[in-house]
């Protein structure tokens, strides 16, 4: 038996003895043990009751509680009629939101929002994602089925390209998911634009660019490069409409293509994949990166922006929320930096490096180069 296996067996035996009810009770009665027992109890309760916090936030968002209290601090009695709640129900909601750190009861007896609630009110896309998460909640009623590889019906229907087939989505479906992606694109674009200097590039092509929100933000921030977007026809039409309405419309070009089936336009010296690679399983990711590499001239660069698994401080998002989300969606998976690096190098890219971002929970950025 190897040393590692003996270590695992010894440690498991120790943990098995510690997990006995009498052991846990004995530890809880000790002065220091009691402190750790209480802390563990709180952590365990947070895990098993997390859905109640989610539903409290959803109720506050749907009733616009934070906006109402931002306009005027109120008591449960004064707020309840406007929410369509009884005073008792309103008080329950206010107390729950206060316990979650979203509201604060002032010395006047009225309630007002905390900075955490202001983030829900002010940050683009947060309200939309809270509402959208009801689909994920429905799909995760049976988490074992999702882990077995059976996609959930709600998210698979919302993302029409996520099924086993590769048919293009119809316009209404494309509008729905493009609007959701665009609602949070401002935060992502800000992270990417802060992480990398785009001004040295002549022609930037955003593959899978949706309705053009990222390229529009890039155009506002960097006056130089020509900007190209490639996406499915139903989505590309939305980008064309957005760009036509801009005073600098001549900077943009849109190509309606299925980037897994059709060669990409050449002549870009930078291609961006913003929240695209993680939507593909490994085989599709390899096909996509092969097309990207073929479209780039030697010395041109590829920028990948998406959340990465095992990112320090962001594991609850990348390793829990996002991993289960994509599993429920039925396609793609979040990858670690090493896994993305392996895919890039297998496609022929070199000099792969990670660029620092201010909020890795939102996105990480990897830059790679097509060698000469």
What are these regions (language model features)?
Residues 22-202:
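Conserved Class I S-adenosyl-L-methionine-dependent methyltransferase catalytic core
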Residues 303-347, 352:
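C-terminal alpha-helical "lid/dimerization" subdomain adjacent to the S-adenosyl-L-methionine
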Residues 1-22:
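Eukaryotic partner-binding/assembly regions in large regulatory complexes
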Residues 348-372:
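Core SAM-dependent methyltransferase catalytic element
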Residues 105, 113, 304, 351-354:
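Short beta-strand "wing" residues that participate in macromolecule-binding interfaces
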Residues 123-313, 351, 361-364:
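Conserved adenosyl
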């Amino acid at each position: 038996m190897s040393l590692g296996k003996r270590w695992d067996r010894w440690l498991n035996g120790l943990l098995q003895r510690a997990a006995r009810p009498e052991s846990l009770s004995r530890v809880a009665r000790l002065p220091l043990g009691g402190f750790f027992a209480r802390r563990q109890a709180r952590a365990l309760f947070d895990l098993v009751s997390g859905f109640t916090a989610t539903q409290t936030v959803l109720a506050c968002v749907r009733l616009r509680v934070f906006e109402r209290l931002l306009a005027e601090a109120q008591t449960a009695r004064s707020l309840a009629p406007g929410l369509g709640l009884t005073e008792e129900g309103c008080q329950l909601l206010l107390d729950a939101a206060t316990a979650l750190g979203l509201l604060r009861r002032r010395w006047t007896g009225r309630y007002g929002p905390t900075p955490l609630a202001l983030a829900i009110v002010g940050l683009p896309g947060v309200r939309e994602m809270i509402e959208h998460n009801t689909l994920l909640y429905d799909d995760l009623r049976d988490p074992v089925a999702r882990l077995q590889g059976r996609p959930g019906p709600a998210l698979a229907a919302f993302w029409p390209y996520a099924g086993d087939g590769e048919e293009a989505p119809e316009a209404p479906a494309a509008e729905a998911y493009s609007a959701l992606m665009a609602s949070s694109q401002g935060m992502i674009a800000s992270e990417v634009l802060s992480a990398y200097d785009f001004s040295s590039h002549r022609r930037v092509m955003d593959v899978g660019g949706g309705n053009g929100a990222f390229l529009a933000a890039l155009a506002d921030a960097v006056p130089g490069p020509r900007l190209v977007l490639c996406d499915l026809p139903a989505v590309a039409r939305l980008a064309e409409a957005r760009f036509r309405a801009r005073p600098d419309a001549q900077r943009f070009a849109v190509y309606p293509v299925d980037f897994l089936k059709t060669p990409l336009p050449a002549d870009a010296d930078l291609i961006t994949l913003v929240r695209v690679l993680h939507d593909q399983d490994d085989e599709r990711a390899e096909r996509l990166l092969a097309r990207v590499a073929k479209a780039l001239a030697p010395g041109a660069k590829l920028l990948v922006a998406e959340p990465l698994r095992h990112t320090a401080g962001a594991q609850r998002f990348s390793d829990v929320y996002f991993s289960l989300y994509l599993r429920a969606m039925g396609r793609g998976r979040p990858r670690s930096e090493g896994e993305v690096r392996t895919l890039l190098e297998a496609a022929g890219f070199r000099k792969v490096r990670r660029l620092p971002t201010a909020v890795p929970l939102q996105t990480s950025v990897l830059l790679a180069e097509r060698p000469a």
